[in-house]
Structure formats: C-alpha cells, structure tokens
Amino acid sequence: TTSTSTTTTVPEIIDFDKLFFEDYFGVKWNKENITWRFAEERMSTAYLEEEYSVIKPSINRINYTKKAFQVWGDAVNSINFKQSENSDNADITIGIVDNVPGRNVGFWESTWNENNEITYATIIIENSLGGTVFLTTILHEIGNVLGLGDISPRQDIRSIQEDPFQENFVGSSLWEFDVQMIKQLYDE
C-alpha cells in the first residue's frame, strides 16, 4: 500500500467579521508611506477629540515603538513606516499618559473617509507599562490602527490582536497568524 500526504501552504481566507469581536470596521490605509510621532505635552484623540496631557517617552519606549513599527512593516510589503521629523504632522500620533480611562492599558482611535481609507490615527498608552508589556501593547494598538480588530483569546491561534493579551511579545518577527491577517487585509 502507498500512503500520500498533502501539505497546504496557501493560507485559508480569514473571515474578519467572525474573527474580531470588536474594533473592526473594514477600513485600511491607502498610502505607501505612513508616518508616526510621539505627541509633545498635549494631544487630542483622532475621533472623539478628547484632550490628554502626555508624558515624554523614555529612550526605551522610543526604541520599543520603533521596533513595533518595524515588526509590522516587515510583515506587510505595501506599507513603509517612518518616524516623522515634523512634530506637528504625522499619520499616527502616540501619547503616553497617566491613568488610561477604563480598564485599558492602551487604546486607539482612527478617522477614515467615504472610501473606508484611514486618514489619521491616535494611540494612547498607559505610562505605568514597561518592557515587553509596553511592546506588546504598542504592537496590538498598531494592529488596530492598521485596520485589524480585537480577537477573543483562542487556543488554536497565536495573535498580538488577542484581547486580553495571552503572552508578551519577545521576538523580532510578527507571529504567523498576524502576518496572515495583515497580508490579507492589504491584499498581498
């Protein structure tokens, strides 16, 4: 007798509407170069325009944030991330604050146009976070501002978009399921 086995390397299509339990709106960026910056002193959130006093980021937090954008950038070919040289103008503004509202350690807001193209986004991160918890949180929030939603924790996947987090991110490459999701969202 002869046995054969088949390995499928083509990822299946993910049904985002079923996968994400919140924060998914069917929107994405339609530009190749996306800039980001840390807010200085005060910032307003993208959608609700709530005002926050922000804390200057430490060198470690700046480096973790650069790493987070690099990790997402390595996973999606159609987008390049660049830290903005202009403190008043960036596509994504990040603020570190004391006492993020609610039970959150971070949250995001975006605005988009009638074509479901994201035009501006903000990320708020809790000041008390450090190390890999900060990195995990900023990675998750970047996933949100790229257009991905939040996933209820599951045994069959490993994703930075799981909420609450199931593990802290310590690698240098995005997890396989996250790569699959972002490539699907951006038609790669």
Predicted segment positions?
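Residue-level preference for alpha-helix termini and adjacent loops
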Residues: 28, 70, 159-160
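Short, small-residue-rich loop/turn micro-motifs
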Residues: 38-42, 98, 150, 165
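Disordered inhibitory propeptide/activation segment of secreted metzincin zinc metalloprotease zymogens
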Residues: 2-61, 109-115, 173-177, 183-188
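Metzincin-family zinc-dependent endopeptidase catalytic domain
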Residues: 59-156
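A broad, low-specificity signal marking well-ordered, structured residues that form hydrophobic/aromatic
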Residues: 5, 34-35, 92, 123, ...
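Metalloprotease/metallohydrolase-associated module, dominated by Zn2+-dependent proteases
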Residues: 119-133, 149-188
